[in-house]
A protein has these predicted regions:
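Hydrophobic/aromatic residues in alpha-helical transmembrane segments
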Residues: 32-36, 84, 120, 149
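Transmembrane helix boundary and interhelical loop/hinge segments in multi-pass membrane proteins
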Residues: 33-53, 67
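Hydrophobic alpha-helical transmembrane segments of multi-pass membrane transport/permease proteins
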Residues: 1-2, 22-33, 137-152
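Long, hydrophobic alpha-helical segments
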Residues: 19-42, 74
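Terminal transmembrane helical anchor/hairpin motif
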Residues: 2-5, 9, 147-179
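A structural motif at transmembrane helix-loop-helix junctions in multipass membrane proteins
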Residues: 111-163
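Secretory targeting signals
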Residues: 4-24, 64, 69-128
């Protein structure tokens, strides 16, 4: 945001990684869900799923293949976008090893985040018969995991006022959120 990093002695990659991490939590799950929500439900609607399942390919192999392919697409987009952004920032403003480590960590965690939400989207697609239903559930999942979950935790921490929930339950609930 505006004024981010004012008075902080960190290189551009470290500051950019922090900014992009915030943005990534919103966009990567949404992109992964949009990419994967109709992978199986859409094929069932179009009539191509029975054809794919008529081959000697097992259901789990089809699911795994779609997961790997869609995760590769999300990962490639992340890698290309972040490499261009980070490379440009580093070339224009310089970098330090700590910033490079932060940048690589950002890429790795963003790819993992994308993979989790591709898997969720495929699970939704596999469990619904229509792509419209899968789309509605996928958007609902995004809303719950990315927006409402954190708001509910924040409200619970405020209501707890530093009590047992904040000290012992809250850290585990933060880790339980895939976003």
């Amino acid at each position: 945001g505006a004024g981010q990093g004012a008075g902080v002695k960190a290189d551009i990659l470290t500051l950019s990684a922090a900014s992009l991490a915030t943005l990534s939590v919103y966009l990567i799950p949404l992109i992964a869900l949009i990419l994967s929500y109709d992978a199986l439900a859409g094929e069932a609607e179009r009539g191509t799923l029975p054809l794919a399942l008529a081959t000697p390919v097992k259901r789990w192999e089809l699911f795994a293949g779609k997961f790997l392919a869609q995760t590769a697409v999300v990962s490639a987009a992340i890698l290309i976008g972040y490499t261009i952004a980070g490379g440009t920032a580093a070339a224009l403003m310089g970098w330090q090893m700590a910033g490079l480590v932060a940048w690589v960590r950002l890429i790795a965690t963003s790819v993992a985040l994308g993979a989790v939400f591709v898997a969720l989207g495929l699970a939704v697609s596999a469990s619904t018969a229509r792509s419209g239903t899968a789309a509605a559930i996928a958007i609902g999942l995004w809303l719950v995991f990315v927006v409402l979950y954190d708001l509910a935790l924040l409200g619970a921490v405020i209501a707890d006022n530093g009590g047992a929930f904040t000290k012992s339950v809250f850290p585990w609930l933060v880790l339980a959120n895939p976003a």
